[in-house]
Amino acid sequence: MEFYGLIGEKLSHSLSPKIHNTLFKDLKIEGAYKLFEVEKENLGKLIESIKLLKIKGVNVTIPYKQDVMEYLDFISDEAKKIGAVNTIYLEDNKLYGYNTDYYGFGTILNNNEIVIRDNVAMVLGNGGAAKAVITYLLDHGIKKIYLVSRKIKGNSADKDERIEFKTYEEISEIKGDILINTTPLGMYPKVDDTPVNEDIINNFNSLIDIIYNPRETRFLKIGKNSNKKVCGGIEMLVGQAIKAEEIWQECQLDNKLTQGLYSIFENEFK
């Protein structure tokens, strides 16, 4: 039996156990995926216990994606750029850290044939999720990113001449190719919220919302009614889990299996 888990603060509503246990079944792995709720002062002890108990892999969620980094033996390039780790792999008693949110966002783009090279994107929000999105866009040839936040502030992922900071009051005339919501506005239960109005949405061709509950946010519904290409966050959620599993199992998962997983979890939310 192999053991895996999720480290965080409040985990009772997490879909991670269901996703990974479904993957274990499909891959015929005798695995168990547990939830590890921990207070910040005990995080170091928990990380050390991963080695002692030979837990093969863990995911990390808020608020510990930055805090775990000091306990790791290796951190991948994308995780260093983003400044956060959400996947840890134990091998030869060493802990390896990765950021699979980066790959999960790439899954949305690839599955929906959204081209980013030489295009213009606007990213709404400047929190932890935005860092993974911005890093992926920069690494894959985006021409320009407008980074929109209520308060203009930089982080390690933002030191690139292709990024221009804007407040919400400054974006009404900006036109581009891809509009990406990384804020929680529109998330269940406040499903009538939207980060921007129809006039701004109509200035873009494709909309991505990394929220997965509800499946189609008001932000996406407005875009859909204007005949925009719209993509919700369930593919990012499942995509980052698939990448974590590929790291732990040291293999690439079959495309038929992964597409089946998207279908299963698309029906989790209305």
UniProtKB/Swiss-Prot annotation:
Record keywords: Amino-acid biosynthesis, Aromatic amino acid biosynthesis, NADP, Oxidoreductase
Reactions mediated catalytically: shikimate + NADP(+) = 3-dehydroshikimate + NADPH + H(+)
One protein family per Pfam: Shikimate_dh_N
Positions with a binding annotation for NADP(+): 77, 125-129, 210, 233
CDD domains (alphabetical): NAD_bind_Shikimate_DH
Binding site for shikimate: 14-16, 61, 86, 101, 212
Record carries keyword Protein transport: no
Recorded GO MF terms: NADP binding; shikimate 3-dehydrogenase (NADP+) activity
First-level EC class: oxidoreductase
Any one cellular-component term (Gene Ontology): cytosol
EC number: 1.1.1.25
Active site positions: 65 (proton acceptor)
GO biological process, one term: amino acid biosynthetic process
Origin superkingdom: Bacteria
Involved pathway(s): Metabolic intermediate biosynthesis; chorismate biosynthesis; chorismate from D-erythrose 4-phosphate and phosphoenolpyruvate: step 4/7
Gene3D superfamilies: Leucine Dehydrogenase, chain A, domain 1, NAD(P)-binding Rossmann-like Domain
Homology family: Belongs to the shikimate dehydrogenase family.
HAMAP family named among the record's database cross-references: Shikimate_DH_AroE
Subunit structure: Homodimer.
Job description of the protein: Involved in the biosynthesis of the chorismate, which leads to the biosynthesis of aromatic amino acids. Catalyzes the reversible NADPH linked reduction of 3-dehydroshikimate (DHSA) to yield shikimate (SA).
Protein name: Shikimate dehydrogenase (NADP(+))
Origin species: Clostridium beijerinckii (strain ATCC 51743 / NCIMB 8052) (Clostridium acetobutylicum)
